[in-house]
């Protein structure tokens, strides 16, 4: 990956595409963390742990949270351990990209989000297609590397690289939590 980035450095235009994360302008989007999908995901317990940390932080700071579910009749609902009796806007979809779902697009337009933290599964399918579509709409997309996953490491790594080269902001769960909190108080 280092060799690739040396040959293909991000442009200044992409590097300047970063905004301060303000609570009212930021959405945490949890993509397809469903019963029948999660068991085959590499390091799935760490992924769930990190998503739950993001949820806890967003709940504490009143950052909105939304959930997508890919074909829930076939793949099951979002993991109960993710929801923990909380109710979040949920968008059921058959499309891989959340951006193809009119209800989701209406939701992000209604709240005028500028920043979307995208986490969940699978990196090379729904995370990738959703994020690229949202980037095309001018949104700032942040990808916590340790809160996305796929069944295969090569798919996960390649999707993450493609996302960054497409203009998404690379991050980690802890980094995003600290950026949202802005202080140790």
Question: Can you name each region flagged by the protein language model?
Answer:
Residues 27-33:
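N-terminal nucleotide-binding beta1-loop-alpha1 segment
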Residues 35-40:
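Short acidic, Gly/Ser-rich segments with clustered Asp/Glu that frequently serve as metal-coordination loops
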Residues 24-26, 41-67, 72:
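A short alpha/beta connector and helix-capping loop motif
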Residues 33, 53-57, 179-180:
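Bulky hydrophobic/aromatic packing residues
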